[in-house]
């Protein structure tokens, strides 16, 4: 005989092909079942511990089916030993090895017992010790075990604790062997995890297969009449196996009734089998004596299959008001109001009575309803109260629509953004955002959210990592993370984090033929262009905006040097500029038409470079005063692009005059603003 562990490897194969293991009773002396059952118990519990990894290997241990043939699981060492579960399966060559990968059927699970270290990626622990459990489950444990099976059932040992429980017809379904094991022991109710899952899924399969296999399978699976659980009362309940985790398939009491669900799902025959499995899991905990068949049946009590009538469109206040107004006396008792509502609306006629609470709630909390004590009758004062409409509120009930109940979710539906402008982030945040106190009025919320000064200090804006996640950075998507790359040195431009990149970007355009949109990828290496050193510093400014800046710079012919500008312009194609704002597109178009204005712009934009970068900008662009591209004569295409004229505060940069900022941030500011 071979210890279950090794068996698991072969077993898994064996099981599948043989359709079940033949468990030699001799192998498990404890198992009394002689396999006298109509179909020999092919104890799927091969005793091979769950494959080393507790994998439910694809082995499909199918006890089902019946491989009446004695399948031998050949496992060298039954780690099952945890449970005393060392079952040695007769290694019968008959079993044809099934690929280990094949699913371990549930039965395999129980047999998983302790997984040898070998095959399974998953550690041995949590192995289902049930190897003998199939056989081992004591008849008693399965209350339903057929009498013929019980003798077999005696859980042999017990430590195995009916791990046998699942003959695992379920095994049919390929369980993720790796995951199954993992699942198994991940949950202390392990079975629930892998086994349950298998059971459930396999049950469905089994449910179809079982009816045929079931007779044999049940018997073979469980001495207890094919009850999967076949769970012996043995405390070990396989689950105890390595972890003491209730990994055991359904063996452990921990196995939750959910498993039993499986049973219930399976076809009636399989149901027994499954129930036992399930109950086994439940039972195991209880020594198997208390099989929980009930849990095995899914709870369907709440599902009547019919929906309640639609709730009236009127509010409770309105309906109560109608009732009172239509009464001859103008007042009604609570019970009369109930009667009116039931008569008038189908919704109130069903079994649901929660609406009565709503009626009482509305009567007592709304000032429009007034409570009148019942007058003195012949004898004592009347019991209860009348409800009437307060004269001061009568007008509320004259307009039918005023109290009409709005459909659920109505308010949320009307809470839509007033205009899409915000989406673009152009003006969304309002110029006075707290985030913009440094004078960067890029209305977009994106800017508002950044701490520019902090960003400047680091040379990377806080959002740098985000790389233009902001609404205004449409091209952010292109940029990847902040491509701050533009050769960005660490020149922090505290307030123009977004802009600093532009300067670098300008370099990129000038020096690199790379399309501006490549900016993110570029990392602006091109920033090395003639002005690159200063630009690099600028680029360093706000790494987070680098991509945008680079795009803008690239997209615009803002390259610091005119020559580089032209190159950059050429490199840029409109297709490449989609990420750029319309301005950028316009510029791109204009580029072909008028690079000159771009040069001007670039000059201006360089001027915008942050403090200390001004020098670099100065190179080309003392012309920073040049109007932003939108204004430049050559930039006819640019005109249409929206430009936020709001002045942006530029730290005193020697080259850039404030006017540039006013103009739109010297072109590249604009680009940034409208990047999206």
UniProtKB/Swiss-Prot annotation:
Complex and partners: Binds to DNA.
PROSITE patterns given in the database record: FORK_HEAD_2 (PS00658), FORK_HEAD_3 (PS50039)
Expressing tissues: In embryo, expressed in all types of visceral muscles and their progenitors (at protein level). In late stage 10 embryo, expressed in the caudal visceral mesoderm and trunk and hindgut visceral mesoderm progenitors.
Keywords: Developmental protein, DNA-binding, Nucleus, Transcription, Transcription regulation
Biased composition (Low complexity): 203-220, 583-593, 612-625
GO cellular component, one term: nucleus
Protein name as it appears in the record: Forkhead box protein biniou
Record organism: Drosophila melanogaster (Fruit fly)
A biological-process GO annotation: mesodermal cell fate commitment
Subcellular location: Nucleus
Gene Ontology terms, MF aspect: DNA-binding transcription factor activity, RNA polymerase II-specific; RNA polymerase II cis-regulatory region sequence-specific DNA binding; sequence-specific DNA binding; transcription cis-regulatory region binding
Residue ranges flagged as DNA-binding region: 311-408
Composition bias type Basic residues, residue spans: 34-48, 594-611
